[in-house]
Amino acid sequence: MNGDDDARRSLVRHVYRPLLTASNGLVETLSAYLSLGHSLEATARELFVHANTVRYRLRKVTDLTGWDPLLPREAFVLQTALAVGRLASSARN
C-alpha cells in the first residue's frame, strides 16, 4: 500500500471509520482479538467480557465492513485498516 493513497483512503473510509462510529467497542475488541493471536477466550479475558460478547462484536465487525476477522486473509485486511486508520487519525492531530 506504499504510495497507494486511494487504497489507504478506501480502508479508512469503508472499514476504519464505520468501526469507530459504531462506538460499541468494536475497534477495541477487534484490536485485542488480532493482537492476542485470534483467541476469543484471551480477548474476552483482556476486555473483561464473556466470550459470547466477543463473538457478537466480531460478527458486528463483519456486518459493518464485509470483512470477517475469523478468516485469516480477511483478518489481515482488518488489521491493515486499523493501522492505516490510526496513522491517518494521528496525522490529522
PLM segments and residue spans:
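Cytosolic nucleotide-utilizing catalytic cores of signal-transduction proteins
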Residues: M1-N93
